[in-house]
Amino acid sequence: MGKMNESKKIIFVDNLTSINEIENFSNQSNVKIISFDYTSHIKLTEKNIEHEISEIYLTQDTKKLQKQCYEFLNWHDLDIIKKNTSFLNVNISRLCNDQLIHKIIKILKNFSEIKVVVKQFPNLEYFASGDLLLISKLWIKSINEIPNSQKMKFYFDNIEIGINIGKKNIKISIPNSLYKKIKNIIEKVLESILQNENLSKKNTLLVEFNTKKFKKFFLESKNYNKNIAYYGRRRPGIWDLESFKIIKNSQCKIITSNIMKGDILKTYKKNILEIKEKYLELLNSNKELNRFFSIDDISIISVISPIIKLLIIDRLEEIIFEILLAKQMFEGVHIDSVVVLSEIGMTEQIIIQLANQKKIPILHLQ
């Protein structure tokens, strides 16, 4: 902390900040660098760049931060959101909480830390990028921008796949778009092998289950004369020989995107455009939303808005497709009950909201 008092410049760094830019500052004696996450801390350490970690400025109780985070996650319950950004009575803003929660926690933590730093050292020159720049602008009138080295990513942008080679398990990361293409091809092949039947009979829908982890649950369903159908948009029902045998022996039906009839998205292009415009209008100028996303009477909507734009608005076609697919599934498959493991994922939320509309009972298995 002693060197901080001698510094004239403070640089905020996170995992998106260009470390090459930071190297230009590192040899200056009047500069203090603060890392705001583990990834940037490791990168700076590998480059032998002296820095502090932001946690030493975290004075707020983490439980309070978590409480604030969960309050912000309820933004989808605002009447103005439900009224203007729903599709087929599905609350779109509620579908992305599993991704949004990580971003909001990080924003709240960084907000608390930056607040302490700026109040402690008010007259220094500050440098930041990305979210750190937007948060800093809430406290600092003039701040210098550092370029980001990469774009913001979300948890499900990449999918990690484990491949067994001999006795070794090698994990590779692939884009979600590529994963879905591979998954669709495999499911088409498996669909022809398994030949889904009896979808017109009553089925219990299992949503995003791990087939091998719930092997007993799948296999014993036959003993209760109960038809089961699997619906997984993130997780495949079959990915190796063991999971294939479980699905086959349990006579479980795999429901895939092949139930979608034609390019149905074209029918809803106008709806999609209208919802996008409503989101942008609300994020840019709605006073109620400004007040809702506030900490100590300071609105952080300027920090939250870019995340919502990337997470929801830019992916709206994909989200609408998932809603339409689930709707068509309920229309084409006789579902009399639904079982979920979680209520926070997008697939689970879509199924829960549509099932509630149809008064289909939902069991949350823990």
Spell out what each predicted region is.
Residues M1-Q366:
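Catalytic-core helical/loop segments in enzymes performing group transfer/polymerization on anionic/lipid-linked
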